[in-house]
Amino acid sequence: MASQKKQLFKIIILGDSGVGKTSLMNQYVNARFTQQYRATVGADFMAKEVMIDDRMVTLQIWDTAGQERFQSLGGAFYRGADCCVLVYDITNPKSFDSLDSWRDEFLMQGQPKDPEHFPFVVLGNKLDKATERKVQESKAQQWCKSHGNIQFFEVSAKDATNIEQAFQDIAKAAASQEKDEEIFFPTTVTLTKQSQKPQAKQGGCC
């Protein structure tokens, strides 16, 4: 059997409404920021090509609604994900406290094959408002450590601080799952027509 590496990785972004999930995605994919976003209804996604280990792959980044009334739709969007990004707002302690419930919900509804080793990345957004900080970086680092040494970045969707580095690590985390999920194809067999010699007619007596 021959194997082929995946060319598309599905990334899910989760977090409370208002933490900046859409802004993060738009800053990374389009290098743009606006204050005019409306709350995401259901889910939406953007795609971006990125180099990982000297090969080009596509990240399909899903931005999901943070409102409770849409959480029942999660399973349909979470399944098949290669990495889950948990986002909170460093000026909003409640959004940080919600990380546990978002992580648990993803594991329950997304049903990854290996939940203990599934890659999560935590982003503390709105670093541009550091003077209004309510969640200390050390507290977030401790949370990540206690949940399996989850990768962690403080970022700003507004001024792009740490966005590129964070998503590079997100892409690598997604690709790390390939060893367990390689796509296998049957070995190719070439079929050729063999020339058939006409069989001699057998004579018979009437």
Swiss-Prot record:
Keywords: Autophagy, Cytoplasmic vesicle, Endosome, GTP-binding, Hydrolase, Lipid degradation, Lipid droplet, Lipid metabolism, Lipoprotein, Lysosome, Membrane, Nucleotide-binding, Phosphoprotein, Prenylation
Inducing or repressing factors: Expression increases two-fold during phagocytosis (at protein level).
Membrane topology label: Peripheral membrane protein
Catalytic reactions on record: GTP + H2O = GDP + phosphate + H(+)
A Pfam cross-reference name: Ras
InterPro entries from the UniProt entry: P-loop_NTPase, Small_GTP-bd, Small_GTPase
A GO BP annotation: lipophagy
EC number: 3.6.5.2
Phosphotyrosine: modified positions: Y78, Y88
Disulphide bonds in the chain: none
UniProt keyword Metal-binding present: no
Gene3D superfamilies reported in the protein's UniProt record: P-loop containing nucleotide triphosphate hydrolases
GO molecular function terms attached to this record: G protein activity; GTP binding
Record localization: Cytoplasmic vesicle, Phagosome membrane; Late endosome membrane; Lysosome membrane; Cytoplasmic vesicle, Autophagosome membrane
Keyword Hydrolase in record: yes
Segments carrying motif Effector region: 37-45
Modification Phosphothreonine, positions: T34, T40, T64
Binding site for GTP: 15-22, 34-40, 63-67, 125-128, 157-158
Lipid linkage positions (S-geranylgeranyl cysteine): C205, C206
Entry function: Small GTPase which cycles between active GTP-bound and inactive GDP-bound states. In its active state, binds to a variety of effector proteins playing a key role in the regulation of endo-lysosomal trafficking. Governs early-to-late endosomal maturation, microtubule minus-end as well as plus-end directed endosomal migration and positioning, and endosome-lysosome transport through different protein-protein interaction cascades. Involved in lipophagy, a cytosolic lipase-independent autophagic pathway. Plays a role in phagocyte formation and acidification.
Entries under NCBIfam families matching the protein: small_GTP
Family: Belongs to the small GTPase superfamily. Rab family.
Annotated protein name in UniProt: Ras-related protein Rab-7a
Organism whose genome encodes this protein: Paramecium octaurelia
